[in-house]
Amino acid sequence: MKIKLIRKIKQRIRDISNVWSVAGIRNVYVMAILPHFGSKSTRDIRRERKQQAILHYLQTNYQNLILKYTQKEEIPPASNQAPIWVCWWQGENAMPPIVQSCFQSLCSHAGNHLVHLITQENISKYVTIPDYILRKVQEGKISFTHFSDILRMCLLYEHGGLWIDATVYVSQLIPEKVFQEPLFTVAANIDTDNISQAKWMGFILGSSPQGVLCSFARELFFQYWEKENKLLDYFLIDYVISIAKTNLASVRRSLT
């Protein structure tokens, strides 16, 4: 119990520190200090305040970017040969057995779609990512987990297709309709505290080349890391998708 409590306290301190560093004292006050009244638990109130503080910060600071994409519409896929993207940074030979099994299952059920395994050695062949982001990954300022969020948006923006996390096991042929949607993800009928509310899943995401969501998220990530050195929240990708769903009609239609 003591170890769990200490972990929770440390995580809470990290959350507040990151919000303070990126979004300032006002959002820390709203998130962690402002008193609350009513029947909701302190935990629920804190979670909701944290989510609202992060959304407010992002929507305020990236308002011009949001406006840029407000009227853009999704473009239907132009090819039935859309690629499939998966990443294992160290390469296939370094995959642990469970990841190898997942990768083989993906290749076996890809149909006519070419599976591209992105690694540290071949990434520059497929996608262009700013040097300042790659440098911050090397410096440890950007975790590899978050870098993979950036990577999937960049790949889908440049090439379109379907991103699947390396730890997803595919048990049957991927339906062609997945590749025919301008924006594809999966939803789950579950209760969750995540800002996504299980309306989308980042581990599987499909898009047309230069699709609205991936274009918006890619550009926001680029602008964010050009000036920041800390990740505002572990689930930043979900906050970005939430903002897109709220403000961009084409994304909202696809995720409804």
Describe the predicted segments one by one:
Residues 149-159:
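Small-residue hinge/turn detector
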